[in-house]
Amino acid sequence: MRSLTEHQQHYRRPLSFVRRSNRLKPSYQRAWDAALGNELLEVPHGARDTSVAEGFTIDWREEFGRTAPLIVEIGSGSGEAIAHAAASNPETDFIAVEVYRPGAAQLAARIRREGLSNVRVACLDAVEVLDKLLPAGSVDELWIFFPDPWHKAKHRKRRLVQESFVEKAARVLTPTGVWRLATDWSDYAVQMRRVISASASFWNPHLGQRAGDISPLTQVRLGDLDAASLGKETHPLPYEQALDTEGGWAPRFAARVTTDFEQKSVTAGRRTFDLTFLRSAR
């Protein structure tokens, strides 16, 4: 049986993003050009311009000029959260993975403007970054805050946090690594909780907490808040069906600032679900 080439594998895997255009407006292009090879990683591409060429690696100690704890954020957007974290934690190095070029350009410009030397931006597919640029056991924390929920049933195969991704995350995290997640879409939160909890590579330090009446999931189901926030007809569940007896939701991560995106979600009446998982001993 013939094995798939890297090109074939990349095109067969459902992507968690859709790029509609690579064009940047002039101000973003200037920011991109100024940051490329500095704050913005210059990486040779594979089958797509979001993939990494086979065999290419980065020595992160050399890249940052030191040995330090490493935090990776996937889906950094324009960088509100990671720039704040980097400024507050100069002793830690950060990699911001943002597949959309306008966001990556804005983030790189923000890093340069704020004089942050401990952040690098990777405008790449997150799966490619985990598979090819991050050695096993090299990441102290992995952050995924408000990934695209792909809320239509036919698109859910595109969601980033699935069974296959969980083991990729496990590989790159240190034996004491932390995985922090947040979403404002209830069924994606349930999916995250389910697939990560099912892995022997992780355990939930908040197991059983925030269950029952105080669970954000119970609250969403009782009011069908997901539908309400979109202006759709609501179908609240009866109390017995709405009750989340499992819980396991984490308290809000104190270092996660409220971004413009999250504020819009709150204004629309959505609930935020936080999850924290710790790497199990190998």
Predicted regions and their residues:
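Conserved class I S-adenosyl-L-methionine
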Residues: H155, A182-S199
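S-adenosyl-L-methionine
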Residues: M1-V72, E80-A87
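A short SAM/SAH-binding and catalytic strip from SAM-dependent methyltransferases
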Residues: V139-L160
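Conserved beta-strand signature within the Rossmann-like core of class I S-adenosyl-L-methionine
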Residues: P175-T183
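Class I S-adenosyl-L-methionine
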Residues: R194, S199-R282
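A short glycine-rich, Lys/Arg-flanked "PGG" loop and its adjoining helix->strand segment in the class I
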Residues: V161-P175
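A short acidic, Gly/Pro-enriched loop at the edge of an enzyme's catalytic core
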Residues: D131-E141
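SAM cofactor-binding core of SAM-dependent methyltransferases
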Residues: W60, P69-E128
